[in-house]
C-alpha cells in the first residue's frame, strides 16, 4: 500500500505517478464489451488490473468504457465503520478509532480480496473526497498483505477522457485527507454517544444530538424566536399613474411611487397621515423634474457548487437536498444512453469550488460560438472562490456540453432532466457575457415640492440570458437574491419616452396602500443551507444529511416548505444551549470545520484537532451530568388549562413519548392529555368521539386516543373505566362482542375485568392494573363444537399472529384460523361461520372442510342477512 503525507494537496492531474500508468491509447483499444461480473466488471484472466469503486452503477459504467482487460468491483460504500455498540473512540490513547468490518460487508470484502489475488495491480477509484479517501484507505489496509501495487486514482468524470486522465496520473492515498475524515468521525461519535444517553435520561428515550445538526436546529429555533418577538410597524405607500400631457397614446401611461413630501423623504405611518397626504396631492400639478439613464449589467452566476446545486434544487423544484444529491449522483455515475450504454453526464457533484478546467472552458466557448455568438466574451470569465475553499475539484458541469437538455429529453426521466438542465444551463451561462440593460429613473415633481419616482429598464443585450430564451425587457428582471425572488419572475416595465420639463397629468386619484413591516422569513431548505454555508457550519457533502436528520428526529417540521421548530426541538435546544454553550456556539462550530480543513491540508495533526474540541466539551459534559442540565422527567410545569374531568389545573410533564398534560390532582385524578401545536401555542389535544361506538363495559361513549401503536378507542369515563379496543378496525367493521353480565371477576385479586386493546387486538385485563397484571382472552360467546367439551372459542396468539382456539387447551386442541361469527351455516347447519380472506376480501365461510359454504360477496361479515 502506497500512502503519503504531503504539506498540501495537489490537483489530481498533477499527482506524481508511481509506475503502472496506463495510456489513453491503451484504454481506447480496450473499450469493448466485457464479460459478466457481480458489478458488471470484466472477467479477464489473471494478471489484469482490478479497479475498486464505491457503487455498482459506477462499476458498470467503468466496465463499459474500459472493457474486459479491467475487472471492476464495488465496495458498496464504506467497508469499515466504528462499532454500533460502543463509542469506539479511545480518548486515553490519542483518540484512537476502533474500526471494524461493517455488518454485511464481509462477503463484499472477500470478493474484493479474491479478485485482488488474481490481479497484477490494483486501482482504488472511490469518490474523490474525504469519505472516498477513507474508503480507499480501508480497502488498501485489507489488501496490503497481498503485496500488490495499490494506487489511488481520482475520477472526476465518468467518460473515456476522464477515466484515461485518472489512470494516466495515479497517485497515493492522502493520509491527511484520511485523518480529516477520521477527525470528523471521532467528533461526531463523541458528541452523539455522549449527549444522546443524557437526553434519554433527562428528557425521553430515542433522542439524539449532533455536533452540526444541533447547531442547525438552533438556527431554526433562533429564527422562530425572532419572529415571535417581532413587532410589526405600520406604513403606507402611495402610487399615482401619470400620462404625458402632449401624448395621446394610452401606452405612454406610467406608474410612480411617492418619494418625497415637501422635499422630505415620504414616511407615512397611519391611515390619518395617508389621508392628509392624499388631500395635499389632490389639486397639485406635475411635470417631469428629471430623467436619468444608466447602463447596468447583470452578471451570470458562477458554475454550480454542491451547496448552490442543493439551494437551486430546493428553490426551483422544491426538492429536498437529499433528493437533489441522489439525482445528481445518478447523473454522475451513469445513465443509459441509447447506442452508448451507461454514460456519466456530469462531473463529480461534491465540490465547493467554482473553478473550471481550461478544456471545459474551451468546450463551452466552442458551443457558445456556434449557438450564441453575440454572447461570447473575448476570454473565458474567471470566478473567485470563497476564502478557505478546498479547490480539489472543478465546479459541477456537464461532461459534454453538446449533450443539450433537449437532446436528452426522451432519455432522462423528469427529475434527472430538470437537474441536468440546471447544471448544463449554469455551466453555459457562466462562460457568457453579462446581460446589459438601460435603467431609466424619472422624477415627477409637483408644485408643492412633492415628488414621485418611477424606474424602468430596457434590454440592450441579453448576453447570458439568451440561453434561457429570454428576450427584451422580460429578460432584464433585477438580480434579486434567491430569498427575495422565491422563484418569481418580477420585472420593471419599460418607461415611455419622457423629457425633462414636460408636463404630466395624474390619471385618477392616487392609490394609498397599507403595509406592515415583516419579520425575517422562516428558513426553507435553500436558505438554511445558504446560512450554514455562510457561517461555515458543516460542509457541502453534509448539508443533505443535516436536513434529513433534523426532520427525522422531529426537532423541526415542514409546513408550506418552511422549517418550524417543534416543541421537542425548542425544548432540547434550550437544554443544550444552556448546558453546552460551546457546542451550540455557531462560531465555535465553524472554527472546528476550519480545523478539519487544516488537518486535510497537513497544517494540523489529527490528535490536536480532536483534542481542541474534546477538552472544552468534556468539561461541559461533566457539569451537565452533575446537575447542570435540567431533568425534565422530574419536573412539572404549571399551566392554566383545567382538567376536563375534575377541573384542577393541569401540569406539563415529560414521558417516554414526549410532553403531555397531566391533572395536577394526581394520583386522585389520573387524567392525561396529549399536547398539540396550534397557532397560539401548545394546547391539549381534543379527543373526538367515535360516532356510534359505546363502551362494552359501562355503556359510555368511546373516544379516539393515541398510543405507542397508533390510534385506538378508549372509554370516555377513563380512568374510572379502562376499556379499550382497536381503531380504526381492520377490514369490515365488526360489532363489539357483548360481554356477559355475569362476567367472572379477576381470578387473582377479585377485581372487575375490562376490555383493553394491545398490539394483537382486544383482550380482558384486570381493572386494578398495574397492581394486578392478570389478563384473559376476550370471550367470543361461541361454544366449542367438539363433543363433550364445555370450552369456549377464544382468540390466541401464535408465531403467525392471532388465531382462535378452545379455552380448554391443552385438553381440547380444536383451532380455527379466522374469527368465529355467531351465525349458523345455512348449508350444513354448523353452529357458527368463520371469517376468511378470499381473493383479498374478507368473507364468511363454514369451518367444516366437507361443507365448503361461502357467504355471497358483499355481505357484511358482522351483520346477519
Identify the residue ranges that each predicted region occupies:
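Conserved nucleotide-binding/hydrolysis micro-motifs of P-loop NTPases
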Residues: 56-59, 76-81, 128-132, 156-161, ...
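Short, conserved phosphate-binding/catalytic loop or strand-edge motifs used
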Residues: 156-161, 307, 327-333, 340-350, ...
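Short helix-coil junctions and helix-kink-helix linkers
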Residues: 308-320, 529-539
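Pre-Walker A segment
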Residues: 281-302, 307, 313, 513
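Basic, low-complexity terminal or inter-domain segments flanking catalytic cores
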Residues: 2-42, 46-50, 60-63, 68, ...
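Core structural elements
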Residues: 184-194, 212, 242, 296-308, ...
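Phosphate-backbone binding and catalysis cores of DNA-processing enzymes
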Residues: 64, 111-146, 151-295, 329, ...
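Intrinsically disordered, low-complexity regulatory segments
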Residues: 2-185, 194, 275, 384, ...
Amino acid at each position: 500500500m502506497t500512502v503519503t503525507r504531503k504539506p498540501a494537496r495537489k490537483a489530481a492531474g498533477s499527482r506524481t505517478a508511481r509506475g503502472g500508468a496506463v495510456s489513453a491509447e491503451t484504454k481506447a483499444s480496450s473499450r469493448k464489451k466485457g464479460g459478466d461480473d457481480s458489478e458488471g466488471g470484466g472477467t479477464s484472466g489473471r494478471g489484469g488490473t482490478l479497479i475498486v469503486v464505491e457503487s455498482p452503477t459506477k462499476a458498470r459504467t467503468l466496465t463499459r468504457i474500459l472493457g474486459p482487460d479491467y475487472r471492476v468491483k464495488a465496495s458498496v460504500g464504506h467497508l469499515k465503520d466504528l462499532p454500533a455498540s460502543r463509542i469506539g473512540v479511545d480518548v486515553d490513547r490519542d483518540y484512537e478509532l476502533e474500526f471494524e468490518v461493517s455488518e454485511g460487508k464481509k462477503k463484499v470484502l472477500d470478493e474484493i480480496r479474491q479478485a485482488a489475488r488474481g490481479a497484477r495491480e490494483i486501482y482504488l477509484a472511490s469518490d474523490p473526497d474525504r469519505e472516498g479517501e477513507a474508503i480507499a484507505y480501508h480497502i488498501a489496509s485489507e489488501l496490503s498483505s497481498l503485496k500488490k501495487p495499490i494506487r489511488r486514482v481520482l475520477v472526476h468524470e465518468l467518460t473515456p477522457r476522464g477515466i484515461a486522465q485518472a489512470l494516466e496520473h495515479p497517485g497515493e492515498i492522502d493520509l491527511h485527507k484520511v485523518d480529516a475524515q477520521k477527525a470528523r468521525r471521532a467528533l461526531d461519535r463523541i458528541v452523539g454517544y455522549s449527549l444522546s444517553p443524557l437526553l434519554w435520561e433527562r428528557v425521553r428515550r430515542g433522542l439524539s444530538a449532533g455536533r452540526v445538526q444541533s447547531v442547525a436546529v438552533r438556527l431554526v429555533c433562533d429564527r422562530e424566536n425572532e419572529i415571535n418577538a417581532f413587532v410589526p410597524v405600520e406604513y403606507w405607500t402611495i402610487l399615482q399613474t401619470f400620462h404625458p400631457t402632449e401624448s395621446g397614446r394610452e401606452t405612454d401611461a406610467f406608474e410612480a411611487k411617492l418619494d418625497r413630501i415637501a422635499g422630505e423623504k415620504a414616511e407615512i405611518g397611519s391611515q390619518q397621515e395617508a389621508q392628509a397626504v392624499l388631500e395635499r396631492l389632490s389639486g397639485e400639478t406635475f411635470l417631469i423634474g428629471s430623467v436619468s439613464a444608466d447602463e447596468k449589467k447583470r452578471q451570470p452566476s458562477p458554475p454550480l457548487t454542491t451547496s448552490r446545486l442543493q439551494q437551486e434544487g430546493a428553490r426551483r423544484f422544491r426538492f429536498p437536498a437529499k433528493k437533489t444529491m441522489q439525482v445528481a449522483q445518478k447523473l454522475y455515475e451513469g445513465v443509459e444512453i441509447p447506442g452508448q450504454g451507461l454514460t456519466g453526464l456530469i462531473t463529480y457533484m461534491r465540490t465547493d469550488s467554482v473553478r473550471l478546467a481550461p478544456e471545459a472552458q474551451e468546450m463551452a466557448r466552442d458551443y457558445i460560438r456556434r449557438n450564441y455568438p453575440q454572447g461570447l466574451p473575448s476570454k473565458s470569465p474567471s470566478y473567485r472562490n470563497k476564502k478557505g475553499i478546498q479547490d480539489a475539484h472543478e465546479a459541477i458541469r456537464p461532461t459534454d456540453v453538446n449533450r443539450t437538455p433537449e437532446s436528452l429529453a426522451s432519455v432522462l426521466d423528469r427529475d434527472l432532466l430538470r437537474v441536468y438542465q440546471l447544471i448544463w444551463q449554469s455551466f453555459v451561462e457562466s462562460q457568457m457575457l453579462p446581460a446589459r440593460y438601460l435603467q431609466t429613473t424619472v422624477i415627477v415633481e409637483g408644485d408643492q415640492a412633492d415628488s414621485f419616482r418611477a424606474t424602468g429598464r430596457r434590454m440592450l443585450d441579453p448576453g447570458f440570458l439568451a440561453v434561457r430564451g429570454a428576450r427584451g425587457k422580460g429578460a432584464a428582471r433585477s438580480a434579486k437574491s434567491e430569498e427575495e425572488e422565491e422563484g418569481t419572475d418580477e420585472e420593471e416595465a419599460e418607461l415611455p419616452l419622457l423629457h425633462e420639463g414636460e408636463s404630466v397629468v395624474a390619471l385618477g386619484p392616487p392609490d394609498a396602500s397599507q403595509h406592515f413591516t415583516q419579520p425575517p422569513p422562516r428558513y426553507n431548505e435553500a436558505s438554511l443551507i445558504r446560512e450554514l454555508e455562510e457561517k461555515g457550519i458543516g460542509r457541502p457533502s453534509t448539508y443533505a444529511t443535516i436536513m434529513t436528520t433534523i426532520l427525522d428526529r422531529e426537532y423541526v417540521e415542514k409546513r408550506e416548505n418552511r422549517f418550524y421548530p417543534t416543541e421537542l426541538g425548542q425544548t432540547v435546544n434550550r437544554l443544550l444551549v444552556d448546558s453546552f454553550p460551546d457546542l451550540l456556539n455557531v462560531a465555535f462550530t465553524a472554527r472546528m470545520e476550519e480545523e478539519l480543513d487544516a488537518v486535510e491540508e497537513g497544517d494540523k495533526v489529527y490528535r490536536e484537532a480532536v483534542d481542541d474540541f474534546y477538552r472544552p466539551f468534556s468539561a461541559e459534559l461533566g457539569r451537565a451530568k452533575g446537575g447542570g442540565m435540567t431533568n425534565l422527567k422530574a419536573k412539572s410545569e404549571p399551566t392554566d388549562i383545567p382538567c376536563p374531568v375534575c377541573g384542577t389545573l393541569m401540569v406539563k410533564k415529560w414521558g417516554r413519548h414526549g410532553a403531555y398534560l397531566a391533572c395536577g390532582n394526581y394520583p386522585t385524578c389520573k387524567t392525561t392529555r396529549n399536547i398539540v401545536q396550534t397557532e397560539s401555542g401548545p394546547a391539549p389535544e381534543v379527543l373526538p368521539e367515535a360516532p356510534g361506538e359505546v363502551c362494552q363495559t359501562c355503556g359510555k361513549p368511546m373516544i379516539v386516543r393515541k398510543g405507542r401503536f397508533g390510534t385506538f378507542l378508549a372509554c370516555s369515563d377513563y380512568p374510572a373505566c379502562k376499556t379499550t379496543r382497536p381503531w380504526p378496525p381492520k377490514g369490515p367493521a365488526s360489532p363489539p362482542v357483548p360481554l356477559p353480565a355475569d362476567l367472572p371477576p379477576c381470578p387473582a385479586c377479585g377485581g372487575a375485568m375490562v376490555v383493553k386493546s394491545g398490539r394483537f387486538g382486544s383482550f380482558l385485563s384486570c381493572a386494578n392494573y398495574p397492581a394486578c397484571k392478570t389478563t384473559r382472552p376476550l370471550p367470543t360467546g361461541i361454544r366449542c363444537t367438539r363433543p363433550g367439551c364445555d370450552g369456549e372459542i377464544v382468540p390466541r396468539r401464535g408465531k403467525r399472529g392471532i388465531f382462535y382456539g378452545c379455552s380448554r387447551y391443552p385438553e381440547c386442541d380444536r383451532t380455527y384460523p379466522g374469527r368465529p361469527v355467531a351465525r349458523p351455516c345455512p348449508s350444513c347447519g354448523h353452529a357458527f361461520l368463520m371469517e376468511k380472506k378470499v381473493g383479498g376480501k374478507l368473507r364468511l365461510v363454514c369451518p367444516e372442510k366437507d361443507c365448503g359454504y361461502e357467504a355471497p360477496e358483499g355481505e357484511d361479515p358482522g351483520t346477519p342477512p
